[in-house]
């Protein structure tokens, strides 16, 4: 369920663990691919996405487990990267989030009329 957190955000998935170590999971949809076999996010400047990275950083600093999951809706890719040239601020905030322990994952998905299936984990390429 979406739960409010931070200054003015809602998390996509919140896991309330009885031991007190909660998990905050933000999910991003990815469709951009400008280079062979490489998927990228974001496809435009995203101040909201940057805000989410900073909010996750704060939650991680407080001892929570935080995850950013990129669901790549393309079958022609094997890798994922932050599109630094499209949104420098998002890229810099992703570095801050990594520094504070936010976990990043990217998964390739198969999109059909029946739904979206997660296929496999993608390698994340650092810029």
Indicate where each model-derived feature is located:
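Conserved catalytic cores of phosphodiester-cleaving nucleases, focusing on short active-site segments
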Residues: 11-43, 56
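A general structural detector for well-ordered alpha-helical segments in enzyme core domains, enriched
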Residues: 52-55, 93
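Domain-level recognition of nuclease-like catalytic cores that cleave nucleotide substrates
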Residues: 73-127
